[in-house]
Curated annotation (Swiss-Prot):
Top-level taxon: Eukaryota
Family designation: Belongs to the nucleotide-sugar transporter family. SLC35B subfamily.
Compartmental location: Endoplasmic reticulum membrane
Keywords per UniProt: Endoplasmic reticulum, Membrane, Sugar transport, Transmembrane, Transmembrane helix, Transport
Gene label: SLC35B4
Motif (Mediates endoplasmic reticulum retention): 326-331
Official protein name in the record: Nucleotide sugar transporter SLC35B4
Membrane topology: Multi-pass membrane protein
Catalytic reaction list: UDP-N-acetyl-alpha-D-glucosamine(in) + UDP-alpha-D-glucuronate(out) = UDP-N-acetyl-alpha-D-glucosamine(out) + UDP-alpha-D-glucuronate(in); UDP-alpha-D-xylose(in) + UDP-alpha-D-glucuronate(out) = UDP-alpha-D-xylose(out) + UDP-alpha-D-glucuronate(in)
Keyword RNA-binding in annotation: no
Keyword match Mitochondrion: no
Gene Ontology biological process terms in this record: regulation of gluconeogenesis
Ranges annotated as spanning the membrane: 4-24, 30-50, 59-79, 92-112, 117-137, 153-173, 201-221, 229-249, 251-267, 268-288, 291-311
Length: 331
């Protein structure tokens, strides 16, 4: 029952989280900092109450290691959300972040001296080609949609290039954080709930440097039209409602992934998360009518197939099917 519940939480929480993030970004593209701050604050408070036991429970992993991880995590979160302010459409944002496999493999080879099979290199090549196709086609759309004048088109393209640079940086930093996390878990054991709390609580002072931007967007949120929440009948500015729902769905999404990692094999977790990204992407295209050409679909297909190949889903499904047959023959 718990694995089924976890899958339900991942799909419901993560997919709806993307919807509310897009609703926020469409109205105020530069609202990434206030969204990141609200998410971090909520998870930090929840973790302080239920995981850290109001600060009485000492951490299993020394704080100095969390400080390194937190610096990377904070940077990745802020840069990823800020990229939406740099002419990056939500579908491209989702596709580009699916390139985490490429970043993990590159850094795994360079830092951990890992070696992979030809099959995995092929899958990574597919993911790379898929991301390149989607990125290239999005670049053409940015210049054509902003062609009020040649100067405007060029300026929009430069901002878009900065957005791609930001996403690439966040992708590599995220992969480096994953490798660092892996070495910590090998040394101190897995403490994912504790890591979740410290990764969100320790960076909170860093938002002081973003306070001006957060305040400006809070003022803009206050000026948005009023919205009455169904059932409870409370009225509040609609942007605050979107932010509240984004925080709640983010928490549901994270809890779902956490339950999934404790109940299922890592292969299942990867497959569920990949399928969730694919569903979110399709919903974003259909519901928000984001521009998506045949080339974008081809690129997305390459990314999806490459990800499934990397996780060796078909091989593992084949093994699991053959095991019951062997058992029945023995009986």
């Amino acid at each position: 029952m718990r694995p089924a519940l976890a899958v339900g939480l991942v799909f419901a929480g993560c997919c709806s989280n993307v919807i509310f993030l897009e609703l926020l970004a469409r109205k105020h593209p530069g609202c990434g900092n206030i969204v990141t701050f609200a998410q971090f604050l909520f998870i930090a408070v929840e973790g302080f109450l239920f995981e850290a036991d109001l600060g009485r429970k000492p951490p299993a992993i020394p704080i100095r290691y969390y400080a390194i991880m937190v610096t990377m995590f904070f940077t990745v979160s802020v840069v990823n959300n800020y990229a939406l302010n740099l002419n990056i459409a939500m579908p491209l944002h989702m596709i580009f972040r699916s390139g985490s496999l490429i970043a993990n493999m590159i850094l795994g080879i360079i830092i951990l001296k890992k070696r992979y099979s030809i099959f995995k290199y092929t899958s990574i090549a597919l993911v790379s080609v898929g991301i390149f196709i989607c990125t290239f086609m999005s670049a053409k759309q940015v210049t054509s949609q902003s062609s009020l004048s040649e100067n405007d088109g060029f300026q929009a393209f430069v901002w878009w290039l900065l957005g791609i640079g930001a996403l690439t940086f966040a992708l590599l930093m995220s992969a480096r954080m994953g490798l660092f996390q892996e070495t910590l878990y090998k040394r101190f054991g897995k403490h994912s709930k504790e890591a979740l709390f410290y990764n969100h609580a320790l960076p909170l002072p860093g938002f002081v440097f973003l306070a001006s931007d957060i305040y400006d967007h809070a003022v803009l949120f206050n000026k948005s039209e009023l919205y009455e929440i169904p059932v409870i009948g409370v009225t509040l500015p609609i942007m605050w409602f979107y932010l509240l729902m984004n925080i709640i769905t983010q928490y549901v999404c994270i809890r779902g992934v956490f339950i999934l990692t404790t109940e299922c094999a890592s292969l299942t977790v990867t497959l569920v998360v990949t399928l969730r990204k694919f569903v979110s992407l399709i919903f974003s295209i259909l519901y928000f009518q984001n521009p998506f050409t045949l080339w974008h679909w081809l690129g997305t297909l390459f990314v999806f197939i490459g990800t499934l190949m990397y996780t060796e889903v078909w091989n593992n499904l084949g093994t699991t099917k053959s095991e019951p047959q062997k058992d029945s023959k023995k009986n």
